[in-house]
């Protein structure tokens, strides 16, 4: 079952308040060789509240607090007893919006109890295994922008800087202290540069950098995934025929056009790493017909 309520209140021309309430009732019943006997009932109350303050037409700040609960999934039950996770999320942000730039900045602190984290291991059918981290957090800064450099040029940068930590981690009776959460890079940077020599033609350079990350939660050196930087190129041209179709869009995408050899994911078997290498240079073409 699910119940949801939402309210907004305009205090002044500049200040507005909002609140959300959600109640979820989840019941799991199963009896199989994979899961064993399961008869669990979860009752989650997920509130959210915050405020927006508009300084002027271009600048707005916001603050919010939310609690979210999440139940384990079937795969979690198949791989051992796990508990639902609870998240307390606090966010503070600023939005700038004018004719030449749209800028969004957000600072977040996410405090978890029993966070369901990836362990880096796979089960016998290749599904990722998760377990509970009794206490953990994610603290970060997110920034994205759209900047009009001229009528022909536009740039859309974004980045995330974060610290993602298990606190007082204990794995099968061994104490590890505070360690990085698996598959959680602390630096992610992206950019899109768009050139439109004419209105119908768009040429885009897409770039992404992902910092190093780990494939387990105890910072084993062998579990490290190196950082990588990938470049893609996209071109699109729009026709506006007078009959049948309102619009025809031709597009082409060259992924990893520098043919970079990199690994973006992997898993651990005990202390031994395995990797998923990504494709080198590859091409896609598209045709979009709009009636």
Question: Which residue stretches match the model-derived regions?
Answer:
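Membrane-embedded beta-barrel scaffold of Gram-negative outer-membrane proteins
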Residues: 54, 60-66, 84-170, 255, ...
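Outer-membrane beta-barrel translocator domains and adjoining extracellular loop/strand segments
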Residues: 29-36, 72-80, 115-124, 162, ...
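Signature of Gram-negative outer-membrane beta-barrel scaffolds
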Residues: 1-54, 77, 171
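Gram-negative outer-membrane beta-barrel transporters
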Residues: 13-17, 26, 109, 131-218, ...
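Transmembrane beta-barrel architecture of outer-membrane proteins
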Residues: 1-4, 44-47, 87-93, 102, ...
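Short loop/turn motifs that connect adjacent beta-strands in outer-membrane beta-barrel proteins
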Residues: 14, 56-58, 100, 152, ...
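Conserved C-terminal beta-signal and adjacent last beta-strands/turns
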Residues: 63, 90-92, 180-291
């Amino acid at each position: 079952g699910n119940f949801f309520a939402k309210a907004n209140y305009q205090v002044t021309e500049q200040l507005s308040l909002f609140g959300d309430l959600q109640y979820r009732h989840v019941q799991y019943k199963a009896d199989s060789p994979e899961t064993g006997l399961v008869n669990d009932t979860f009752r989650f109350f997920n509130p959210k509240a915050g405020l927006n303050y508009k300084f002027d037409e271009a600048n707005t700040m916001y603050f919010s607090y939310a609690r979210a609960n999440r139940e384990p999934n079937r795969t979690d039950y198949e791989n051992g007893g796990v508990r639902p996770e609870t998240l307390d999320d606090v966010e503070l942000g600023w939005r700038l919006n004018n004719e030449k730039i749209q800028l969004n900045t957000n600072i977040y602190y996410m405090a978890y109890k029993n966070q369901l984290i990836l362990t880096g291991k796979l089960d016998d059918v290749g599904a990722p295994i998760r377990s509970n981290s009794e206490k953990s957090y994610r603290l970060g800064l997110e920034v994205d922008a759209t900047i009009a450099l001229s009528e022909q040029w536009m740039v859309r940068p974004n980045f995330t800087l974060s610290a993602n930590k298990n606190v007082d981690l204990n794995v099968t009776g061994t104490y590890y202290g505070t360690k990085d959460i698996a598959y959680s890079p602390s630096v992610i940077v992206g950019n899109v540069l768009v050139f439109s020599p004419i209105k119908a033609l768009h040429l885009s350079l897409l770039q992404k950098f992902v910092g190093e990350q780990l494939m387990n939660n105890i910072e084993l050196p062998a579990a490290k995934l190196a950082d990588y930087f990938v470049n893609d190129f996209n071109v699109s041209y729009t026709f506006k025929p007078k009959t049948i179709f309102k619009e025809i869009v031709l597009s082409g995408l060259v992924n990893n056009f520098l043919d970079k050899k990199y690994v973006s994911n992997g898993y651990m078997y005990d202390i031994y790493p395995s990797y998923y290498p990504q494709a080198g240079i590859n091409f896609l073409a598209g045709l979009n017909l709009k009636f």
